[in-house]
């Protein structure tokens, strides 16, 4: 079975999916298994979404982090990466040319000129054993 879920809540998506596709301004910017994405996020927008997932270890009424700036104007296609104006890692190249959406390692695709550093990152508590594969659920 396949389910298409559209959400800004990657924590919720992780509880239902084996694989996550992250989109920004109508374009796919990162795609990987839940475990790979949460453990080794590469796209700054994906990282921002993960940072906004509510967590039980935060004090009550703590505001969630927000992505600075405004969403892009979808009526005018950007020459470069549409996330560049809001991205903390952006450089001139990002505004000038759109990065290719490529598979940078088996099963992990992303489109970013200046991705977050590669390397293991702890999977968020409570997400290590979620999703249909972990629970034996049907696809």
Language-model segment annotations:
Residues 19, 31:
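Short, glycine/charged-rich "phosphate-handling" switch motifs in NTP-dependent
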Residues 7-8:
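H-loop/switch region of ABC-family ATPase nucleotide-binding domains
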Residues 33-134:
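Charged, flexible cofactor/metal-binding loops and thiol motifs
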Residues 23:
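Catalytic metal- and UDP-sugar-binding loop of GT-A-like glycosyltransferases, i.e.
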Residues 1:
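Switch/coupling loops of ABC transporter nucleotide-binding domains
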């Amino acid at each position: 079975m396949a389910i298409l879920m559209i959400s800004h809540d990657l924590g919720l998506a992780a509880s239902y999916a084996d694989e996550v596709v992250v989109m920004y301004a109508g374009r796919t910017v990162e795609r990987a298994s839940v475990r790979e994405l949460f453990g080794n996020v590469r796209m700054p927008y994906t990282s921002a979404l993960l940072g906004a997932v509510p967590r039980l270890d935060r004090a009550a009424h703590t505001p969630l982090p927000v992505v600075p700036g405004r969403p892009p104007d979808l009526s005018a296609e950007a020459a470069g990466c549409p996330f560049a104006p809001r991205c903390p890692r952006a450089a001139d190249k990002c505004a000038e040319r759109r990065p290719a959406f490529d598979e940078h390692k088996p099963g992990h695709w992303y489109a970013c000129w200046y991705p977050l550093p590669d390397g293991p990152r702890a999977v968020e508590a409570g997400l290590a054993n979620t999703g249909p594969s972990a629970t034996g659920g049907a696809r």
